[in-house]
Regions:
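N-terminal signal-anchor module of multipass membrane proteins
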Residues: 1-19
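Transmembrane helix interruption/hinge and helix-loop junction motifs
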Residues: 3-6, 58-66, 172-180
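C-terminal ends of transmembrane helices
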Residues: 23-32, 78-87, 146-156, 194-198
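Hydrophobic, membrane-inserted alpha-helices
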Residues: 47-56, 78, 162-170
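Membrane-interface helix-loop-helix junctions at boundaries between adjacent transmembrane segments
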Residues: 59-106
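Long hydrophobic alpha-helical segments that form multi-pass transmembrane helix bundles
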Residues: 92-152
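Predominantly late transmembrane helices and immediately cytosolic-facing juxtamembrane segments
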Residues: 184-201
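Single conserved hydrophobic/aromatic residue that forms the stacking wall/gate
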Residues: 238-247
C-alpha cells in the first residue's frame, strides 16, 4: 500500500476518534428495540461480541464475499441515513441508492489504483479477480445521479442533495480514498446519523443516565480498538511485503 503518509494517519485518526464513536450509541439503540433490562443488555453485549467474532472469522476465510457484503451493507446504511436527513416520505430507494453508490464507488472511481491497494490487503490480493467488473457499479452510479437530479426538479428538498453530491465528488477527485472517506464519514455521515439518533433516543428513552453511561463506555472501547488497529496497520505496512510482490 506504500508508505503510510501523514494524511493517511490523519484520516485514520478522524475515522476512529470522530466517526467510529457514533456507533457507540448501539447500546442506547439496543435499549430502544427492547434490550432495556440489565440481563437483556448483557444478552445484547454477548450477541454483539459473538457476531463481531463470527464476522472476523468469515472475513478471514471468505474475504471477497465478506468485502462484497460489507460494501452492500455500507451502501444501504449510508444511503438510508442520507435519505432520512431529507425528511421526505418518498423516493426512499432512489435517494438511498444514489447516495450509497456515490459515496462508495465515487471514491473508488476517482482513486481506483489506491482503492484496490487497500482492498488488496483486506482480501489478500483476490480482489483483482473482480476488478474488471467494476464498470457495472460505476455505470449504475452515474445513472442514479442523473435520475436524482431529475427527481430534484420535482422535489425541492432534494436540490441541496444535488449540491452536496457534486461537492462530495469534487472531494473524492481531489483527495486520496482514505481522506475522502474520512471527510464524508466524519463530517457528513456522523453528523446526520447522530442528529437523527440523539433525537430519537432522547425522545423515547427515559433513562438518560443509561444512554450517557453506555455511550461513554462504547466510545472508550472504540477508541482503544481504533488505536490498536492503527498500530496493527502501521506494523503491517512496514514489516510485510505487498501481496502483489508475491505474484
Amino acid at each position: 500500500m506504500g508508505d503510510l503518509t501523514i494524511l493517511n494517519i490523519i484520516s485514520f485518526l478522524l475515522i476512529f476518534f470522530i466517526g467510529l464513536p457514533h456507533g457507540s450509541f448501539d447500546g442506547a439503540v439496543a435499549a430502544l428495540v427492547g434490550f432495556n433490562k440489565r440481563f437483556q443488555f448483557i444478552q445484547f453485549l454477548f450477541y454483539y461480541i459473538i457476531l463481531f467474532s463470527l464476522v472476523i472469522l468469515f472475513w478471514l476465510y471468505f474475504p471477497i464475499f465478506a468485502l462484497s457484503i460489507f460494501i452492500i451493507m455500507t451502501i444501504i446504511h449510508f444511503g438510508l441515513c442520507d435519505w432520512t436527513n431529507f425528511r421526505i416520505n418518498k423516493y426512499k430507494y432512489s435517494v438511498s441508492f444514489t447516495y450509497g453508490m456515490t459515496i462508495i464507488f465515487g471514491i473508488i472511481f476517482f482513486n481506483e489504483n489506491q482503492s484496490f491497494l487497500i482492498f488488496e490487503y483486506l482480501t489478500n490480493d483476490k480482489i483483482y479477480l473482480i476488478q474488471k467488473y467494476f464498470f457495472i457499479p460505476y455505470f449504475l452510479t452515474i445513472l442514479s445521479i442523473v435520475y436524482f437530479i431529475y427527481l430534484s426538479i420535482f422535489e425541492k428538498k432534494l436540490r441541496k442533495g444535488v449540491i452536496e453530491i457534486l461537492f462530495l465528488l469534487i472531494i473524492f477527485y481531489l483527495f486520496d480514498p482514505l481522506l475522502s472517506f474520512a471527510i464524508y464519514f466524519c463530517f457528513f455521515h456522523t453528523y446526520k446519523h447522530l442528529k437523527h439518533l440523539v433525537k430519537n433516543i432522547y425522545s423515547n428513552l427515559t433513562n438518560k443516565k443509561f444512554v450517557i453511561y453506555s455511550t461513554f463506555v462504547f466510545t472508550v472501547v472504540s477508541w482503544f480498538g481504533g488505536l490498536g488497529i492503527i498500530f496493527y496497520l502501521v506494523c503491517l505496512l512496514y514489516t510485510s511485503p505487498s501481496p502483489r510482490d508475491n505474484r
